């Protein structure tokens, strides 16, 4: 049995609650900690994240396979902080799934929304589907990046469900721990944990099925990588999962900007 699948589903409600330690008062050696975590299980990586940042660690949940990240974090800390982006263009199935996860774990999910002062002029000037003509950058910038930037401005550390196998072009070098190259500032470094980075899609789904976790029903219809409804479609059996996102654009540009550090580090 792999190290990331050690907690039976029957123990979900009986596991002892984790008490958050206080965040570290002194900076840690980032390269040393990253190196020590490189071969650890996702649970060990999350445990280290909670040990160093306590209640200042936030979990990012996209309404897709990263329910695995939420499950692992919740089992370590029943008061885990989770946020999710509502772009206003998600599938109905994704909205229902976010509520299902909220109810399943009994947690609050901080749902982030676009700033209407930015969104309304875009829609008024260019309509609802300008991304098919102009590319997805402008729309994602308003619907995703700005709300996330606003959220992360008050956060010291966050954890994402990024995996290396999700995109050979932009995520193959995702580290388990890094300084976020997209949202850090010289005055305020933002620490980013990627506990699932070494897991494969098969391992993620093995975890979901073994523990009978809730999942987005779109997965049953051929959707693997799930984003906004107009920009996501099912993939064929031999296609990579990212081919279902922004299919009208060049393959190497298929990042919305939430993890722009992946592109910055490759520049």
Curated annotation (Swiss-Prot):
SUPFAM superfamilies, alphabetized = Adenine nucleotide alpha hydrolases-like (SSF52402)
Question: Which stretches does UniProt call biased (Polar residues)?
Answer: 11-25
List the pathway annotation: Sulfur metabolism; hydrogen sulfide biosynthesis; sulfite from sulfate
Indicate where this protein resides in the cell. Cytoplasm
> What's a Pfam family this protein contains?
PAPS_reduct
Free-text comment on the cofactor: Binds 1 [4Fe-4S] cluster per subunit.
Q: EC number(s) on record?
A: 1.8.4.10
Q: Where is this region: Disordered?
A: 1-29
Q: What are the positions of the active site? A: 256 (nucleophile)
Q: Name one GO biological process term.
A: cysteine biosynthetic process
Positions that bind [4Fe-4S] cluster: 139-140, 228, 231
| Coiled coil segments of this chain | none
Name the chemical reaction catalysed here.
[thioredoxin]-disulfide + sulfite + AMP + 2 H(+) = adenosine 5'-phosphosulfate + [thioredoxin]-dithiol
- Cofactors, names only: [4Fe-4S] cluster
Protein family = Belongs to the PAPS reductase family. CysH subfamily.
Name of the protein described by the UniProt record: Adenosine 5'-phosphosulfate reductase
Give the encoding gene's name: cysH
């Amino acid at each position: 049995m792999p190290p990331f699948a050690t907690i039976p589903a029957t123990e979900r409600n009986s596991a002892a609650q984790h008490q958050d330690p206080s965040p570290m008062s002194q900076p840690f050696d980032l390269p040393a900690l990253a190196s020590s975590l490189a071969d650890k299980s996702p649970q060990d990586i999350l445990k280290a994240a909670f040990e160093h940042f306590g209640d200042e660690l936030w979990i990012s949940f996209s309404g897709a396979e990263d329910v695995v990240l939420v499950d692992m974090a919740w089992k370590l800390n029943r008061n885990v902080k989770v946020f999710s982006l509502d772009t206003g263009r998600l599938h109905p199935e994704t909205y229902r799934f976010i509520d299902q996860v909220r109810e399943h774990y009994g947690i609050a999910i901080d749902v982030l929304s676009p700033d209407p002062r930015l969104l309304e002029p875009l829609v008024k000037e260019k309509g609802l589907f300008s991304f098919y003509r102009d590319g997805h950058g402008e729309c994602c910038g308003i619907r995703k990046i700005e709300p996330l930037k606003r959220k992360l401005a008050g956060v010291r550390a966050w954890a994402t469900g990024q995996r290396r196998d999700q995109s050979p072009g932009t995520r193959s070098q995702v580290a388990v721990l890094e300084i976020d190259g997209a949202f850090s500032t010289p005055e305020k470094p933002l620490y980013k944990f990627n506990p699932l980075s070494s897991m494969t899609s098969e391992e993620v789904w093995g975890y979901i099925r073994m523990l009978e976790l809730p999942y987005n029903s779109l997965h049953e219809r051929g959707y693997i990588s799930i984003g906004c409804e107009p920009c996501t479609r099912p993939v064929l059996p031999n296609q990579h999962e990212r081919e279902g996102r922004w299919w009208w654009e060049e393959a190497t540009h298929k990042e919305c900007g939430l993890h722009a550090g992946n592109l910055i580090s490759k520049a």
